[in-house]
Regions:
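Active-site-proximal loop/helix segment associated with metal-binding centers of metalloenzymes
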Residues: 151-231, 270
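Active-site neighborhood of phospho(di)ester-bond hydrolases with catalytic His/Asp-centered motifs
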Residues: 63-65, 86-92, 134-139, 215-218, ...
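Short, basic interhelical loop/turn and adjoining N-cap
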Residues: 2-5, 22-43
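Short Lys/Arg-enriched helix C-cap and helix-to-coil transition segments
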Residues: 45-57
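Core catalytic region of metal-dependent phosphoesterases/phosphodiesterases
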Residues: 64, 69-182, 186, 190
Length: 314
């Protein structure tokens, strides 16, 4: 079989064409059955994968989301996933409990959350020791800007960031202790890890694309299994000019893993102690689930399906 004929078979195996095996057989002018061609194509793909590195993990990604500091989980549960290529933090690092619309019997100051969240991220990054850290924001992180918008004049708003993550990752911040008359500076993570060899990146958006996988933390929510992820898939198909093969959804505090068409849909669960978060008490909502996602990609950023998974912690 000629090289161009093999490429046609590989395109069918890799779902890059809608032609069926009968059409491909006729186009190639082969005198074999479509089933024989399909079986031969399996061997062609296995050999091509071996030669060109397909299905060989080039990039391993550990994605956690919904830490909701101070309700975060102990990062030592991630022991098996040390030294991954990328630690991806998919939003809602801090809870912004004091700024929420939910009724509360006590308040946790945003400054306390920022200080604790920053230290937790430092300890987490040192423990995992990834090559890169990529973080986007979530709906709880954006509460920061929403609170300022409701309570400050627009001129003052220009002095404020959108989320506390900008301060934690890029700008640093100061805590002015009015009681003790002290001022403490907290350096940003880009400075903390400047000489470590770990690349730190904060993406000022609710979504980030790594390879052909989207990691998203939208404001929208649907209660059905993978319904929010499916809605995100539809949005991304309308807006992403390039192809993608996976959507990893934060925000829902649910776990799920399925395919729709050629797109893998994952809901990764929450990396926080959901039993300590009392927002849903008495609302008869479905139980929250704790978990995280492992995403593996080949050298071209394509998803390696059999090595990508959701890890459920409860």
């Amino acid at each position: 079989m000629m090289a161009w004929q093999i490429r046609c078979c590989l395109a069918k195996r890799r779902k890059e064409t809608d032609m069926d095996w009968i059409e491909i057989r006729d186009m190639l002018g082969l005198e074999i059955t479509p089933d024989q061609l399909r079986k031969q194509a399996v061997g062609y793909e296995e050999y091509d994968n071996y030669i060109h590195g397909f299905n060989t993990v080039a990039t391993s990604i550990l994605s956690i989301s919904d830490l909701h500091v101070p309700f975060q989980l102990d990062y030592t549960v991630l022991e098996k996933y040390k030294n991954v290529d990328i630690l991806q933090i998919n939003g809602d690092v801090v809870d912004c409990q004091a700024l929420s619309k939910f009724p509360k019997q006590y308040r946790i100051s945003p400054m306390s959350e920022m200080i604790e969240g920053r230290q937790y991220l430092i300890d987490l990054i040192k423990y995992i020791n990834p090559k890169r850290v990529i973080c986007n924001y979530g709906n709880h992180d954006i509460r920061f800007a929403n609170y300022f918008a409701k309570n400050l004049d627009t001129d003052i708003l220009q002095l404020q960031p959108n989320t506390s993550l900008e301060l934690i990752f890029e700008d640093g911040f100061k805590n002015y202790d009015k009681v003790n008359r002290t001022k403490t500076h907290y350096a940003p993570l880009v400075d903390v890890f400047e000489d470590s060899g770990i690349d730190i990146q904060f993406v000022d958006d609710w979504k980030v694309k790594i390879g052909k996988t989207w990691f998203v933390h939208p404001l929208a929510y649907r209660s059905g299994i993978l319904a929010t992820a499916d809605k995100a898939k539809g949005f991304l198909q309308d807006t992403d000019k390039d192809s993608f093969d996976c959507v990893v959804m934060a925000h829902t505090h649910s776990v799920g893993d399925s395919e729709k068409g050629y797109i893998r849909l994952i809901e990764q669960g929450a990396f926080c102690d959901v039993n300590k978060m009392r927002y849903s008490d008495g609302r008869l909502q479905k139980p929250q689930k704790m978990g995280f996602a492992i995403v593996c990609q080949d050298k071209d950023g394509n998803l390696i399906k059999d090595k990508t998974k959701v890890v459920i912690l409860d």
